[in-house]
Amino acid sequence: MSETEYDVIVAGYGPVGETCANLLGYYGIKALILDKEKNTYPLPRAITWDAECQRAMSHCEFLSEVKTRKIRGVDNKDANKKSIMKITMEGFDTYNYQHRILFIHQPQFDEAHRENAKKYPTNTIKTGSELLAVNEVNGIINCTYKNVDTDEKFTVKSKYLLACDGANSTVRKLNGIKLNSLDADESWMVVDGYTKSSFECFAEIDAIQYCNPARPTTIIQGVENCFRFEIAYMPGDTIEEIQKEKVFRKYIDEWIGDNEVEFSRTAVYSFHAAAAEKWSIGNIFLLGDAAHQMPPFMGQGMNSGCRDAENLLWKINGVLKGLYPPKILASYESERKPHVARITRAAIKMGSVINAKNKFKALIRNTALRIQGYIKGNENIFPILNGNRLGNGIHKCLK
């Protein structure tokens, strides 16, 4: 095999591409990883890492390098800051791993993944490389990319292409795969920062859903005293105005108290729910945000992409080594798509619960959650977190 031929090309080197790079290296598969950006994104985005994804990466033996914080629980509070329902992580299935959900600081998370991926001799990692063209002929994929500094172009070949290039996926667009909106768009103001000491409101838990219909807000204590506020963008707001510190501090000072804080980012984001019409075409596969997008209310966007990688790569490894027939790869979409759809629906539903802006609906919500918490306690309030079935799998594909 020449230097321009690979078993797998990975387009995109965010968390999903990083997961692919580590798994490909672990399996000893010759891989090329491309990303337009030279470095990791310096600001936090994803903040949760669940047990399934921790377990999937455990054989790569670098998890201790990822800085994490155990999540003790979430408190849902009404407009008067009285607890509606408190959820602790006790009782939730950990899938035979140490913790059900951990907080992460994504820039450090990315760096740990990338540093480990470098150790595999079968990985060729080219950041600062922009994918320009893709086509597949007789099962061989041809990719053209350029160096973003010199504009020098290169053509490479592979047996498989994994599109981990995000919501605006170049690979998806080049292959004409339609992205269907699920009509769940919402705008939220995100404020990230650091504090020298923990906020008083986090004495027993690590996240608060402030279900105030006047301005729903999520407050999170992350890794090493990082914090995040997600503040609902309301009618009458303007992006320019709400990002001013004197404005957004009106909504968060009551939680910060006397703590000294430093803000690292303020931005208004539109949260989307969408799904690609199909997740593969020939030997080209879409993973992560390239295939599906969901609101962040369950912290499952990045985790769903990492599950995609784990599901697909052991099958590709088996096909390349002659252990399984190629048709096993059809089970990637048939297994993952229904699973992601269910989690997306749950995230949309949870968002609608948190984001009730009508006072009457908020009152009904508060009453229902209090009753549910009283009857069920902490167990299975959100059954989506306690095990999820895949769609039709290998037995269907191998018939």
What residues fall within each predicted segment?
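Helical substrate-recognition/capping region of FAD-dependent monooxygenase/halogenase enzymes
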Residues: 2-11, 26-27, 36, 80-81, ...
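Conserved hydrophobic helix-helix packing surfaces used for dimerization/oligomerization
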Residues: 8-10, 31, 284
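Conserved mid-domain beta->alpha element of the FAD-binding
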Residues: 12-22, 163, 263-350, 354
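Glycine-rich FAD pyrophosphate-binding loop
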Residues: 25-45
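A conserved short coil-to-beta-strand element within the FAD-binding core of flavoproteins
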Residues: 127-141
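Conserved FAD-binding catalytic core of PHBH/FMO-like flavoproteins
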Residues: 140, 160-271
